[in-house]
Amino acid sequence: MRSSNPVLGRAFNQRGFASMNPGATIQHDAPADSPQKLEDLYSAPSASSLRTGRMTIDDVVTRTGILFGVLVVVGGAAWTLNLGPAFLMIGFLGGFVLAMVNSFSKTVRPALMITYAGFEGLALGTLSHYYEGAYPGIVSQAVLATLAAFVGVLFAYRSGKIRVTPKFTRVMMGAMIGYLVLGLVSMIGSFAGVGNGMGLYGVSGLGLLLAIGGVALASFFLILDFDQIQKGINAGAPEQESWRAAFGLMVTLVWLYLEVLRLISILRSSD
């Protein structure tokens, strides 16, 4: 099974998860089609990760909740303390380093993923406080818009309206590369004073289009996350991999929130 997600890929590209022995939950001494066998199948309790050793959707939800709990607590503290730009840089740089370590590590390290959530909380809390001061109410708008996008994309994926195909994956990865190149050009331009120091995002019209494209791209990457989580569960990925799945989901949601925050700020600054 191949994964396009750079966070989930190293774990879920492995083969052989399904060959794990989850442990017996029913009797196996009866013929496969015997009444006793069927009765055991119906009466057996639902398998959990504690009994099978495999990742379940409940595991992913629980780990995601833990990571976002840490992010919210640290972010709330950073917001309350009204920390300066230095802490914003520490948060983003620390988060970037840990994102790279966790993404390319073959070993799942929950402690590093929780630490990543803390750094992101520091960065997002500080940045959100700044945006809230410039555009009152923007943070609640961005949070609600991010949640709405998450729910909408999840519904579209679960209903089968959007399917992950090799072509879809190639298009998304190509779009990501293009977006990263534009981001680099924008950053270089900001140093040269383009867009009043905001780079391409400060250029009227173009900045709005880039922001909309960023929100759309981050939303579509949620689909890749959902697909890889489902494939990991179907392949019998180890329970520990639920941490990696939760981490990958958090990375995309943080990216989506930042893109939404930037889009709303551009829209409100043009009023």
Q: What label would you give each PLM region?
A:
Residues 1-271:
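A hydrophobic alpha-helical transmembrane-helix feature that marks the membrane cores
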